[in-house]
Amino acid sequence: MVEKILIHRILTLFPNAIARKLLLMLTFILIFWIIYLASKDHTKFSFNLENHIILNQGNIFKKYSHSETPLCPAVSPKETELRIKDIMEKLDQQIPPRPFTHVNTTTSATHSTATILNPQDTYCRGDQLDILLEVRDHLGHRKQYGGDFLRARMYSTALMAGASGKVTDFNNGTYLVSFTLFWEGQVSLSLLLIHPSEGVSALWRARNQGCDRIIFTGLFANRSSNVFTECGLTLNTNAELCQYMDDRDQEAFYCVRPQHMPCEALTHMTTRTRNISYLSKEEWRLFHRSNIGVEMMKNFTPIEVIPCNKSENIKKNCQIGMKTPFPSGYTLKKMWITAFCKQIKFNETKNINDCLERKLIYLMGDSTLHQWIYYLQKAVKTLKYFDHHGAGIFKTHVLLDVERHILIQWKKHGHPFVTKKLFSVKDENYIPREIDQVAGDKNTAIVITLGQHFRPFPINIFIRRAINIQKAIERLFLRSPETKVILKTENTREIEQNAEMFSDFHGYIQNLIIRDIFVDLNVGIIDAWDMTIAYCTNNAHPPDYVIQNQIGMFLNYIC
């Protein structure tokens, strides 16, 4: 219609018939040309838009199907790798290589000398007692470097009292050992040579050489058929593998894929040690039981500590975010007394129930935190066990008090989890993912412990997990700054265990890493390392009175 009106108006301007015909032809040609160009551009625009949508849909499908790229990485893989590298370099500087050809040139507890500085007949409660240690080898020669793994402790058996001592290494063969005299009475002093520096260096080198000292065996179930295959953090095989990846956090676990079964058929796992060592025969001599934990202060008589009428410093109530010194406290009559804050005693069921009322508590970690569940179930009769079904002792464990709206849940951490007992992997997750699933509020508390199961593996695996947990806590605090997060450090463990894989030296290094990575986070610290030295338990799973005091510290943080 518009075209006809336009043509009619143009023709009235040209009365000549021939001119009008020519003009009419040119007008039609022009109109068709415009329509052609318009339709071509429209087609081109439509194609580009549709193509853009198709490509984007393809990318989304790719991400969800193959998980090549994390959707919202909290920290780039590159940044994490740089942090791991930086921490590793610092540790390598602290633990330099100390090769030796004979045990005689390593540190000797017998030939080393310890001297009390400024000795007195009596000491005042609260004083600091200092000891200078000069180390020598088995030939009596002064050593010119440090790096020995020492454990200092003061104790009074009659009072059931104990505390850690602080060791300062001057890196020249001399050490300062400092004790804070926390209580009155006769006090004995102990300084153990756990490993000489040469043994420490050997452990550090051996630890970081491979993941193959532990064998993981996975159970795949498909209808009536069960198949066991080898699994691990790394696998050196040409067989087809199932890859269980967490791309965001750069965590990986692998299993040899059984024939005619999907990777999702993996249901359970068990582990055992492999007969392999990265220590030489000469190095192994340092880890015979008779050479581990040798007393360096055998001939010291107990010292006498008196009150001296010294006034005690007024301490603030224990709260999350406080910096914990070392030693962080001491034991007296089996009770743990903190050195940096004022504790509330939770000795009665009513006190504990009042504290826990309306609380959601998530325990994430290993069996040393699982002990809390068992203790609370015995100590607080109103907490009832909720059966999650499933097999084995390492399934998710829940205690409920419906009347008081209390929930306490324990879940094991993700790989590596080292145990001969068969455990389910279907309810398993890495701790950062578990933290991401907690909404959080002022009545929510999370307790995390990590370490014992990481000791047989290269340290970079532990560092990566700790960094990922730190990032998850930061995300939690962004959505819920009132949520309370508490870190329980590792317990000391049995000296008789395979030192190459389970030595407390590995736990000590992991303790340093945890404190470094979490230093700026507003979290509470339960220094189980310090506690178990003070109690002298030498057991990865200490007795109930130690667990009671760990839980008591936790209750002080959340109430």
From Swiss-Prot:
<dbReference type="Pfam" id="PF24536">
    <property type="entry name" value="NXPE4_C"/>
</dbReference>
<dbReference type="InterPro" id="IPR026845">
    <property type="entry name" value="NXPH/NXPE"/>
</dbReference>
<keyword id="KW-0472">Membrane</keyword>
<keyword id="KW-1133">Transmembrane helix</keyword>
<dbReference type="GO" id="GO:0016020">
    <property type="term" value="C:membrane"/>
</dbReference>
<dbReference type="InterPro" id="IPR057106">
    <property type="entry name" value="NXPE4_C"/>
</dbReference>
<dbReference type="Pfam" id="PF06312">
    <property type="entry name" value="Neurexophilin"/>
</dbReference>
<protein>
    <recommendedName>
        <fullName>NXPE family member 2</fullName>
    </recommendedName>
</protein>
<comment type="similarity">
    <text>Belongs to the NXPE family.</text>
</comment>
<dbReference type="InterPro" id="IPR014756">
    <property type="entry name" value="Ig_E-set"/>
</dbReference>
<feature type="transmembrane region" description="Helical">
    <location>
        <begin position="17"/>
        <end position="37"/>
    </location>
</feature>
<keyword id="KW-0812">Transmembrane</keyword>
